Amino acid sequence: MKEQMKFVRKLPEPIEVQQEIPLRAPYRKLKAERDQAIEDIMTGKDDRLLLIIGPCSADNEPAVLDYCTRLAKVADEVKDKLFIVPRVYTNKPRTIGKGYKGMLHQPDPEGNENMMEGIKAIRRMHVHVIEETGFTCAEEILYPENHRYLSDLLSYGAIGARSVEDQLHRMIASGAGIPVGMKNPTSGDLSVMMNSIEAAQNEQDFLFHGWEVHTTGNSLAHAILRGYVNHFGTSMPNYHYENLKKVLDLYGERTLANPAIVVDCNHNNSGKKYMEQIRIAKDVMASRRYSSDVARIVKGLMIESYIEDGSQKIGEGVYGKSITDPCLGWEKSRALILELAELV
């Protein structure tokens, strides 16, 4: 059988795209300040709650900028209690490889795949978010090769449930230079997540993009609990008090820096019932109030939110409505943010 792979075109190097779409000096300083604030939260120097919130998929630059502009206003209202990082996710993992895979693949969700244009579109959008709202953002590190196109713009990274066992993802996380959350796998096996955190915190040597690479380890690699699927295909949560205590105990069995948990309030924790995110977020806050140990280790929440409630199919054309997983609409999101600030 012949190799079933066609090399379509050579893509530009990350440094070339960074030079074409640069981040200007004042915003590089802003990113450094935001990076330090998040590091202080993860290391316990700052007792604010990290809130990573935004669309399931950042599919449309005008709507994403609109959302982040609204978010910036409420972020200023709660800045003493919450540190907000927009999730601007431009890659979408697909279980069977079909469907919309994010702006990286399709700058126009209704158009053809064009990764040459996609690379530039996602960088341009992240730069515009920083310049227009003052936010540096979170992204999923779905493709290790893609990270360096955005690495000078991002303040938080996540390794997804399907990628967390992959050696290259763990090694990239070990050199990312920002906090990287390692999600529990879809099976719910917490040992996989903990192994991934340990690998990311260690020094690593590996081959990448034609280079021999050495990393010094990422002391801010940490756990993200996102629920799981049992043997019957049913969504099972892992955000409850006993789940948080279990991860605290697992950290205690290892020599890891900066024990931390971020709870993903959607995905299998909510069974993808987006309205459940409100209840789940409050439940986690109650666990933090009940136990000082839980309060110390639960550093943040992750919420899927956009301008309009729910989701739509590609082509329906509702502005600010998710074309992937259902999200909380803006009014509910704003009310939740204000309530969470009162609960910190």
Regions found by a protein language model. Name each.
Residues C56-D59, N258, N266-K272:
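Short acidic, Gly/Ser-rich segments with clustered Asp/Glu that frequently serve as metal-coordination loops
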Residues M1-M42:
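N- or domain-start disorder-to-order transition segments that initiate the globular core
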Residues K2, C68, K81-K246, H267-K272, ...:
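Active-site-facing alpha/beta catalytic cores
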Residues L50-A63, D325:
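Conserved phosphate/anionic-ligand binding catalytic regions in large, soluble enzymes, centered on
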Residues Y306-V344:
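Internal helix-turn-beta structural module
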Residues G54, V263, G329:
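Conserved, mostly hydrophobic/aromatic
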Residues E39-D47, E253-N258:
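Glycine-rich phosphate/diphosphate-binding loops that line cofactor/substrate pockets in enzymes
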